[in-house]
């Protein structure tokens, strides 16, 4: 009898967690806005690219490949869910010996607390396809959240998981003029421990502005196609930090 009761006690939580998990509903790009980009989704190969598809045959191959990394991009949404989960799939599953995987291909959750962005948690990657519970046990009023995307890998897909009885909707667009960065690996986010700690993302949070990141590791070389692209933006400020990459081809 004692052995039977112990089994019930041990396995009941597992059953409860399983039931909770099956009630999670995941929502994709139609339920959040994508920040950190000046290019309409219709002009990209993927919503999480940093250059338009038309640039594939215009820029050098390394620049195009690096533009597939989602550095500086974030998704923003409002939900009344008591918990937030995330599923995301990366393009390359990169790893480097000088930068944590959480910075390369992880995701960061922030909460807008009295008009200031407060760090909540980091989704730790394990491979191409990842799933992580970012926060639990919240109250049920609507709150605004932002998730910063990987710095040195691309995103094929990302979905937000919330309770089946909860709602999710797009946050309001930030109508302020953006800040545009063009530069090197430093701009792209190397070697931040997690996406939210790239300096462009820190500036975005502190000023509550959309910041566009055209950092291309080893390839920020003041090239004409990128100059033409950013010159079409009515930006509050342009920050060009290409000097470390200004070498002969």
Briefly describe each language-model feature range.
Residues 238-249:
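A beta-strand-loop signature enriched in Asp, Gly, Thr, and Trp
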């Amino acid at each position: 009898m004692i052995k039977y009761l112990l089994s019930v006690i041990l396995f009941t939580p597992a059953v409860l967690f399983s039931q909770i998990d099956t009630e999670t509903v995941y929502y994709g790009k139609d339920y959040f806005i994508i920040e950190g980009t000046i290019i309409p989704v219709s002009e990209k190969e993927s919503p999480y690219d940093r250059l338009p598809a038309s640039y594939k045959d215009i820029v050098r191959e390394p620049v195009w490949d690096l533009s597939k990394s989602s550095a500086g991009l974030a998704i923003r949404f409002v939900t009344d869910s008591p918990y937030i989960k995330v599923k995301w799939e990366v393009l390359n599953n990169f790893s480097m010996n000088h930068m944590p995987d959480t910075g390369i291909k992880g995701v960061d959750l922030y909460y807008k607390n009295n008009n200031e962005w407060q760090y909540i948690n980091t989704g730790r990657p394990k491979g191409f396809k990842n799933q992580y519970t970012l926060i639990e046990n919240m109250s049920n009023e609507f709150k605004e959240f932002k998730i910063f995307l990987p710095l040195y890998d691309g995103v094929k897909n990302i979905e937000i998981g919330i309770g089946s009885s909860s709602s999710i909707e797009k946050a309001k667009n930030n109508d302020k003029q953006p800040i545009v960065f063009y530069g090197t690996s430093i701009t792209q986010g190397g070697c931040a421990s997690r996406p939210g700690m790239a300096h462009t993302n820190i500036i975005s949070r502190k000023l509550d502005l959309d910041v566009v990141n055209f950092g291309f590791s080893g390839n920020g070389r003041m090239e004409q196609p990128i100059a033409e692209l950013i010159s079409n933006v009515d930006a509050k400020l342009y920050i060009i930090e290409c000097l470390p990459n200004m070498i002969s081809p």
